[in-house]
Amino acid sequence: MVYIIAGATGVVGSAISKELAKENEVHLIGRDEEKLSSLSKEIDAQYSLIDLTKTIEQREFSKIIPDDKEIKGLVNCIGSILIKPLHGTKTEEFEEVLRVNLFSSYYLLSSFARRMKNGSAIFFSSVAGTKGLSNHE
């Protein structure tokens, strides 16, 4: 059984990866190969360099875990923040926020959910939503 941690090189993702790796097999996903390589060596984990906002990789990333390996859990720590008034936000910036925060979650869950038997998926969100930051996307 394996746990998949997406956004594994961020503060939250790396802490979760380290804790889960103490007693479980983990597979790290991220966009920074240097950080992924370092973390994978530290906790003895496999990793995949994947940018879930890129179309070509979205179709392929579900193949990173062999079909005969059960996925016990999926942890999504991918996220970004754009603090800017709407009237000053370019369409490209808004689309990037959607790719990072929304579409990557969809790609992860749609690719791995059917392979999880009695597994769990955990998605982290921003504390900014509970604090009511002005000019927050």
What are these language model-derived features?
Residues 24-37:
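Conserved glycine-rich Rossmann-like NAD(P)H-binding loop of the short-chain dehydrogenase/reductase
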Residues 89, 132-137:
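Active-site loop-to-helix junction immediately N-terminal to the catalytic Tyr of the SDR YXXXK motif
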